[in-house]
Amino acid sequence: MTSSVGAVLKKYRWQFSGMVAWTLQRVTGILLLLYLLLHVHTISKLSQGPAAFDAAIATFSSPFFKCLEIGLLGVVVLHAFNGIRITLVDLGIGVGKQRQLFWTITVGMGLLVFLAGAIPILLFAVLKVR
Amino acid sequence: MTVLDALIRVQREMDGSIGFRCSCRVGMCGTCAVQVNRIPRLMCSTLVKTLDAEVVTVEPLPHYPVIKDVAVSLAPFFAQWRRAQAAFRPKHADAPTLAIIGKDSRFRQLAATKRDCITCGACYAACSITGMNVRYLGPAAINKALLRVLDPRDAARADRLKTLDQSSDGVWRCHTQFNCTAVCPRKIDLTDSIVRVKRALLRPGKALTV
């Protein structure tokens, strides 16, 4: 299985990026849904008063959750930029250049935005650099 | 040596019972499409050395009933081909002169990139939607219907658009995964055709042009 996947990628030089992008969109969509549930759960603590809410938020300021936050940022960015790619395709823009669209928008621009957010979180929230 | 050459050699020298189909051997008839190392392609146009693999696996195309070994029945493919009304239906069957499509017309220019389908069925095999929904038209039938719909001489535009617009098995089932485009041996941008049909259906007031 692994060798055939490798052969596919080698031979087609990522011509199947459309399928990769589609799968990424599904996986990140489900992850975002799970995050949304957690988010609603945390916000609902507000109904139990400021102390309960502060306690919930305190949990999320630990370095472990900050690392997860970097992951969340990655998921959001992938989903958002791939969404832009899909919208462009549906508008008939760049359909013939779908691979370039995937690499420049979903991967390229996504990576830039991800790093712009992930590096500060890592430095100031996880490693606590001053 | 192509994969087809290799298979013929296997048939002649090792096992005369293996079943596969081929005809033209030059990539123009679309008879020998199979899965080679998990990708749908024409055996006669696939050189073994370009596969860059120790083992070459030849399998029947997925999403089709297998007749024998790697020979499949393209019946599901042609059922959709008929449903999309692939045959041309002229507006003026009794016209005394031939209708002329100018070589500079936009229809003619788009058609040049879309009309080379050899009905090999590779796109239908690569599409993940056809694998889940046997009623889905599939890329080749939609591409053919687009050619007919845009043709100024065609009389069945409304019928075809109705079939294309069906929510459960028309163009809307396409998830723009581009697998069809990636495997087409004639390099037809099938996903582009599907996107064009979708956009045409969303703007019914607009004249159907390229």
For the regions a language model picked out, list residue spans one by one.
Chain B
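Short strand-turn-strand beta-turns centered on an Asx-Gly dipeptide
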Residues: Q35-I39
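Active-site phosphate-binding and catalytic loops of NTP-dependent enzymes
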Residues: D15-R21
